[in-house]
Amino acid sequence: TLPPPSEWAFHLDLWQNPYAVSRYYNVEPFSKEHFDLMRPLMKLYADAGGKVITASIMHKPWNGQTYDAFESMVTWLKKADGTWYFDYTVFDKWVEFMIDLGVKKQISCYSMVPWRLSFQYFDQASNSFKFLEAKPGEAAYEEFWINMLQDFAKHLKAKGWFDITHIAMD
């Protein structure tokens, strides 16, 4: 007799794309209806021994590689005064949902180095979405990510998820 999947040593990491489910069923992403539709699908992953939660912390980390784009589960907002604000509401809902299903060994957050090196944020001063084009090593890239990572680390520690969270790349 096999032990429950939560006790399996095998590290199963299959990417999940909740945005594909919302598009397929034409429901609002991360609404109650969306979670109800995802529950049996993600339960299959958990029951197969899935250990890793796939989270996208930026807009389209893989450009257009997948039919359904991975949107950001974190809202990046540059305030009118130039400071940054990050809203983790969607990220938290998604992670809590997956943990409740039993997927709780690791959270893989994609990605600091996306294919296009283009980073979307909402600019409060212009009331519009903007894109920062920057490469690792450039001052703009470092400023952009340092603000987010410091805030993200604080948030993850408050939620008790810091030790299981990884910044992932593809």
Predicted regions, residues:
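Aromatic-lined carbohydrate-binding surfaces of glycoside hydrolases
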Residues: 1-170
